[in-house]
Amino acid sequence: SGLDIAALCFEENDLLDQTEYTQAALVTVCMAMEKVLRERGLAPDVTAGLSLGEYCAIASAGGMSTENAITTVRKRGILMQNAVPGGQGAMAAVLGLDAGKIEEVLADRSGVMIANYNCPGQIVITGWKEDVEQAADALKEAGAKRVLPLNVSGPFHSSLLEQAGEELGKELEQVDFSDLQIPYVTNVTAEYVTDITKTKELL
């Protein structure tokens, strides 16, 4: 792909502010760490990864090569980056407010939605930047302890990236998957996956 992944990961640069490069770098570092652990005799019985990390989980479980994982997530990053113009999307972590209350505040706001239910007391919202900022003010008024903007380059985990998801599905048709050596847990259903044929749809 012409990407100098070593320079990207180990040299100071501004490219990591763009999800096209961030995703490739994160998967590279994750899989390098996984290789070191295996060399030291630590091998997983099952893998899992959140969002982008699911690609690492699949690669670690034997479902795709590290090279394919890096190439695929770079394409994923490009599609996500192109879906929403730079600076127009945003994400924020809402701390200390019940999920039901957050859902209530966002119910009549079409440009912002919940991205992740991370854990009780920490929920991430995503959407158009202006809508996320307005929702942040409303959530603080509703009792949120804090609403922290996330340092991301787009409105990830939102319906604004629906077209990118469709295009990624086409890209995944070209990826060589292998039979899983161990199960992994998918983000979509939180269930074990043992059949690689289900992976393309779940991603």
Task: Enumerate the language-model features and the residues they cover.
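Helix-rich "cap/lid" substructures immediately adjacent to catalytic or cofactor-binding pockets
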Residues: 1-48, 125
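A broad detector of short, well-ordered amphipathic alpha-helices
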Residues: 28-35, 54, 67, 71-74
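Structural motif
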Residues: 47-50, 115
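Glycine-rich nucleophile elbow surrounding the catalytic serine of serine-hydrolase chemistry
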Residues: 50-59, 63-64
